From Swiss-Prot:
Function in brief: Calcium-binding protein that interacts with rotavirus cell receptors once the initial attachment by VP4 has been achieved. Rotavirus attachment and entry into the host cell probably involves multiple sequential contacts between the outer capsid proteins VP4 and VP7, and the cell receptors. Following entry into the host cell, low intracellular or intravesicular Ca(2+) concentration probably causes the calcium-stabilized VP7 trimers to dissociate from the virion. This step is probably necessary for the membrane-disrupting entry step and the release of VP4, which is locked onto the virion by VP7.
Family from the record: Belongs to the rotavirus VP7 family.
UniProt subcellular location: Virion; Host endoplasmic reticulum lumen
Binding, Ca(2+) 1: D78, G189, T197, E199
Signal peptide bounds: 1-33
The name this protein goes by in its record: Outer capsid glycoprotein VP7
Keywords of the record: Calcium, Capsid protein, Disulfide bond, Glycoprotein, Host endoplasmic reticulum, Host-virus interaction, Metal-binding, Outer capsid protein, Signal, T=13 icosahedral capsid protein, Virion
Positions of the UniProt region annotated as CNP motif: 148-150
GO CC field: host cell endoplasmic reticulum lumen; T=13 icosahedral viral capsid; viral outer capsid
Length: 309
C-alpha cells in the first residue's frame, strides 16, 4: 500500500512538473517571438502604442513640435516672433518649454531622414504645384509607421510581397533603376548585367518611394554613393503626426493604391495670405487637432492626419 501511494504521488508530481515546463516553453516562445512580414525579415523599431487621447489637457505633460519652412521666418522677419508664438500657445494651455519650433530649408531637404522628435508633431508644408509628387511622398512617409531593413542590391534580387511593401530611398541624390526578372532570373526587357537597359523610376531625387509589381523579383541599380535604399513595410498611420498643407486649391492625395478612396481624411482649410495668417489658426485649433491624434502611437486604425490651411 505504501509503495502504491508513493508511486501515485510521484506520477502526480511528474504531471505537474511537465505541465509547468510546457507552459513555460509556450510563454517563452510567445514573449520572444518577432513580428516578421510575409517573406520580409523586417526588424526596425516601433514606437510604443498608446490609445487615442481623450484627456482634456494632454499638453500639460506632452511636447509639441511645429515644423515650418525657412520661408515663413524670412517673411515674418521678426526676431521675437518665436517668443510671441510661445506666449500665444500658453494662452491655449501649452506651458512655456513644451512647444518647439523647428525650421527646415525646403521639402526636398526635409525629405532626407525627417526626424519627428515630439509627442505630437505638426508639419507646415506650403503647397507648390511643381512639387506635388515630392509633397505626396513626404506626407506618405511621415504620416505612416514603417518597418525597414537595409538592402544589399549588389548581392540580392528583391521582390515586393504586397501593397504595403515599398522600397524607400533617401539621400542627396537618388537615381533608382529596376529590372524585372522572370522565373529563370533573366531580365524582362532588360539585361541584368547592363544597368543602362533598366527602367528608370526616379532621377536625382532626395526621397523616392518605389512601388513595383508584387511577387516579381527585381534587380536594382541605385546611386549608393549619395543614396540609401531600404526594404520597408507600412504598418499603418503614425498617429502623432499631422501635415498641414498651406495653400493650394486641392488637397493632395497621398494614397499609394489607385483602387482605393483618396486618403485625404481630417482636413482643415483656411484662406492663406501671409504666414501670420497661417500661424494664428494653428494656435487656435491646436487643441482640437491634438485631441484627434495619439501620443507616440502606431495604431493600425484608419486615421491618418492630413490638413490643409
Amino acid at each position: 500500500l505504501w509503495n502504491y501511494i508513493l508511486k501515485s504521488i510521484t506520477r502526480i508530481m511528474d504531471y505537474i512538473i511537465y505541465r509547468f515546463l510546457l507552459i513555460v516553453v509556450i510563454l517563452a516562445t510567445i514573449i520572444n517571438a518577432q513580428n516578421y512580414g510575409v517573406n520580409l525579415p523586417i526588424t526596425g523599431s516601433m514606437d510604443t502604442a498608446y490609445a487615442n487621447s481623450t484627456q482634456s489637457e494632454p499638453f500639460l505633460t506632452s511636447t509639441l513640435c511645429l515644423y515650418y519652412p525657412v520661408e515663413a521666418s524670412n517673411e515674418i522677419a521678426d526676431t521675437e516672433w518665436k517668443d510671441t508664438l510661445s506666449q500665444l500657445f500658453l494662452t491655449k494651455g501649452w506651458p512655456t518649454g513644451s512647444v518647439y519650433l523647428k525650421e527646415y530649408a525646403d521639402i526636398a531637404a526635409f525629405s532626407v531622414e525627417p526626424q519627428l522628435y515630439c509627442d505630437y508633431n505638426l508639419v507646415l508644408m506650403k503647397y507648390d504645384s511643381t512639387q506635388e509628387l515630392d509633397m505626396s511622398e513626404l506626407a506618405d512617409l511621415i504620416l505612416n509607421e514603417w518597418l525597414c531593413n537595409p538592402m544589399d542590391i549588389t548581392l540580392y534580387y528583391y521582390q515586393q510581397t504586397d501593397e504595403a511593401n515599398k522600397w524607400i530611398s533617401m539621400g542627396s541624390s537618388c537615381t533608382v533603376k529596376v529590372c524585372p526578372l522572370n522565373t529563370q532570373t533573366l531580365g524582362i526587357g532588360c539585361l541584368i548585367t547592363n544597368p543602362d537597359t533598366f527602367e528608370t523610376v526616379a532621377t536625382t531625387e532626395k526621397l523616392v518611394i518605389t512601388d513595383v509589381v508584387d511577387g516579381v523579383s527585381h534587380k536594382l541599380n541605385v546611386t549608393t554613393a549619395t543614396c540609401t535604399i531600404r526594404n520597408c513595410k507600412k504598418l499603418g498611420p503614425k498617429e502623432n503626426v499631422a501635415v498641414i498643407q498651406v495653400g493650394g486649391a486641392n488637397i493632395l492625395d497621398i494614397t499609394a493604391d489607385p483602387t482605393t478612396t483618396p486618403q485625404t481624411e481630417r482636413m482643415m482649410a483656411i484662406i492663406w495670405k501671409k504666414w501670420w495668417q497661417v500661424v494664428y489658426p494653428v494656435v487656435d485649433y491646436v487643441n482640437q487637432i491634438i485631441q484627434t491624434m495619439s501620443k507616440r502611437s502606431r495604431s493600425l486604425n484608419s486615421s491618418a492626419f492630413y490638413y490643409r490651411v
